[in-house]
């Protein structure tokens, strides 16, 4: 016998169950049509595994023939290999090791190491009077992020060590160098951009070793020309600031806070503040610049009476940095050296491995500085070494 309770419940339960089933079926159909078809995201790792040998290949001993050594592949592909003129020997030697140990002991940073300079063995490994070290002041972390540079970056790096000027002067006097280069990371977090810290370091060096010639490779101080003047009056012998590349490529190569005209104004202010100073800059080639752009840059530099220019090949530090557009041949570097000398530059260093501080203490430039310091005779030039073909073309 059917109870009244079961009869009263069944009509309410059954339609609800049917409703839910229909609703679920309709909704799923709509969702399936609305969902876009997504492609599988390819990854180098998974694709390499799929294309590589299987477990059966390993068991049968066929895997060795299917594997490709990345180093061997790079050797076989000329597009992946560095040109032979960009290869350098591993740095070594007594002088090199002594400099390296002193840098560690006094907790100093060098741009030679931080920027992975290829000439570190040649510069650190020379005789005492010929060796050149480039000390990086105010830490190893920059507030800018240029697309060619491997130095670490941060918006808020550590505060400069107040003992750094004293420690730097002590190290340099101990090494007995004839020429030293001081450089710095950009410190946009400091009010003066670090100008007073640099100036104090120069003064300390001159107190402990007045015979040493000092070159400072400084930043642009965000265009503050008063800071450039402070550094120019510190007692240094060479005021260097790198323009890095031609004007058209500057926004793509350098940090957005650095501009071509701003760099020119810094060099110009240094020369105006102390005309006897040797002013110096550096250009990297290989970003895709044209000959016309390089020539215009040299003209701009001569207009502000820049004395020294160096040319070097841009070499990509890591895959995160700008790609090399072209490797400039040594013959082209010779051409730019001769051209710059013919235009009136006192000294030019030009070559694939040349960097802004390369052979900074070479005898010729030391002679120029000492003559200017004592105002003795006419300032010499390297005109006698200019390629005669370049001179004949310009006449």
Swiss-Prot record:
Binds 2 [4Fe-4S] clusters per subunit. One cluster is coordinated with 3 cysteines and an exchangeable S-adenosyl-L-methionine. Its cofactor is [4Fe-4S] cluster. [4Fe-4S] cluster 2 binds at residues 142, 146, 149. GO terms for molecular function: 4 iron, 4 sulfur cluster binding; lipoate synthase activity; metal ion binding. It holds the Pfam family LIAS_N. Residues 127-346 form the Radical SAM core domain. It catalyses: [[Fe-S] cluster scaffold protein carrying a second [4Fe-4S](2+) cluster] + N(6)-octanoyl-L-lysyl-[protein] + 2 oxidized [2Fe-2S]-[ferredoxin] + 2 S-adenosyl-L-methionine + 4 H(+) = [[Fe-S] cluster scaffold protein] + N(6)-[(R)-dihydrolipoyl]-L-lysyl-[protein] + 4 Fe(3+) + 2 hydrogen sulfide + 2 5'-deoxyadenosine + 2 L-methionine + 2 reduced [2Fe-2S]-[ferredoxin]. Residues 1-14 form a transit peptide. Its EC number is 2.8.1.8. It is found in: Mitochondrion. HAMAP family: Lipoyl_synth (MF_00206). [4Fe-4S] cluster 1 binds at residues 112, 117, 123, 357. Keywords: 4Fe-4S, Iron, Iron-sulfur, Metal-binding, Mitochondrion, S-adenosyl-L-methionine, Transferase, Transit peptide. Pathway: Protein modification; protein lipoylation via endogenous pathway; protein N(6)-(lipoyl)lysine from octanoyl-[acyl-carrier-protein]: step 2/2. Transmembrane segments: none annotated. Its main location: mitochondrion. This is Lipoyl synthase, mitochondrial.
């Amino acid at each position: 016998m059917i109870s009244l309770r079961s009869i009263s419940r069944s009509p309410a339960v059954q339609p609800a169950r049917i409703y839910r089933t229909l609703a679920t079926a309709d909704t799923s159909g709509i969702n399936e049509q609305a969902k876009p078809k997504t492609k599988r995201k390819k990854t180098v790792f998974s694709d390499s595994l799929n294309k590589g040998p299987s477990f059966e290949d390993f068991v049968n001993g066929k895997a060795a023939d299917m594997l490709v050594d990345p180093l061997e592949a790079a050797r076989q592909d000329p597009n992946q290999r560095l040109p032979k003129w960009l290869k350098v020997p591993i740095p070594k030697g007594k002088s090199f090791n002594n400099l390296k140990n002193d840098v560690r002991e006094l907790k100093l940073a060098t741009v030679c190491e931080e920027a992975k300079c290829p000439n570190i063995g040649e510069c650190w490994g020379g005789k005492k009077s010929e060796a050149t070290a480039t000390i990086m002041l105010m830490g190893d972390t920059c507030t800018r992020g240029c697309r060619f540079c491997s130095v670490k970056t941060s918006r808020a790096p550590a505060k400069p060590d107040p003992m750094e000027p004293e420690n730097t002067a002590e190290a340099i006097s101990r090494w007995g160098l004839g020429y030293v280069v001081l450089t710095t990371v950009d410190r946009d977090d400091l009010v003066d951009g670090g100008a007073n810290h640099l100036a104090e370091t120069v003064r300390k060096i001159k107190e402990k070793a007045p015979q040493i010639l000092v070159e400072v490779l400084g930043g642009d101080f965000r265009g503050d020309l008063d800071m450039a003047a402070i550094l120019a009056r510190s007692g240094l012998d060479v005021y260097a600031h790198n323009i890095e590349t031609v004007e058209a490529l500057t926004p793509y190569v350098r940090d957005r806070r650095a501009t071509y005209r701003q760099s020119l104004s810094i060099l110009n202010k240094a020369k105006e503040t102390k005309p006897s100073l040797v002013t110096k800059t550096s250009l990297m080639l290989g970003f895709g610049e044209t000959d016309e752009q390089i020539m215009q840059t040299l003209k701009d530099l001569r207009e502000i009476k820049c004395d020294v220019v160096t040319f070097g090949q841009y070499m990509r530090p890591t895959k995160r940095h700008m790609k090399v557009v072209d490797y400039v041949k040594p013959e082209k570097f010779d051409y730019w050296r001769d051209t710059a000398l013919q235009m009136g530059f006192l000294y030019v260093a030009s070559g694939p491995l040349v960097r802004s501080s390369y052979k900074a203490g070479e005898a010729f430039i030391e002679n120029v500085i000492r003559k200017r310091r004592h105002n003795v005779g006419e300032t010499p030039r390297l005109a006698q070494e200019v390629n005669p073909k370049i001179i004949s073309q310009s006449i």
